[in-house]
Amino acid sequence: MASQSTDQPKSIHDFIVKDARGNDVDLSIYKGKVLLIVNVASQCGLTNSNYPELTKLYEQYKDKGLEILAFPCNQFGNQEPGDNEQIMEFACTRFKAEFPIFDKVDVNGSNAAPVYKYLKSSKGGLFGDGIKWNFTKFLVDRDGKVVDRYAPTTSPASIEKDIKKLIGTS
């Protein structure tokens, strides 16, 4: 949900989302951080490649200003059927994910989470704004502006050079 102002959100920092435990998280806490925002799923063919690479990127760059924000989504092939507790256990136990995992959201349609409406309007995809599948990635700069959007099949490791540019270690 956007902040209480009637203005259009100007950055990702203008949103409040729910974490996996149902608590409000004001995304302004990430001001000054580079964000990689990903819609994740536990039972997708891309899961076994994406989660380990996301974890590696996070371990490598979290102290340099990177945060990875994972939003579970069940809109693609019902590949995220579990509840938030099951999703967190899966990601944190199987893949040792230490990055924040948020409440399950819709990324498309009339019930799409406002933060995803903003991401899509900032960086449309090759075939329009809609998210096509799990593990679509958005790279956001330290000011909360969407810099790039990556297809589900783009590996997190291949985004490393873009992350390094934004955090200033290229």
Swiss-Prot record:
GO terms for cellular component: cytosol. InterPro entries: Glutathione_peroxidase, GPX_AS, GPX_CS, Thioredoxin-like_sf, Thioredoxin_domain. The active site is at 44. GO terms for biological process: response to oxidative stress. It catalyses: a hydroperoxy polyunsaturated fatty acid + 2 glutathione = a hydroxy polyunsaturated fatty acid + glutathione disulfide + H2O. Its EC number is 1.11.1.12. SUPFAM superfamilies: Thioredoxin-like. Keywords: Cytoplasm, Oxidoreductase, Peroxidase. PROSITE patterns: GLUTATHIONE_PEROXID_1, GLUTATHIONE_PEROXID_2, GLUTATHIONE_PEROXID_3. It is an enzyme of class 1 (oxidoreductase). Belongs to the glutathione peroxidase family. This is Probable phospholipid hydroperoxide glutathione peroxidase. It comes from Mesembryanthemum crystallinum (Common ice plant). The gene is GPXMC1.
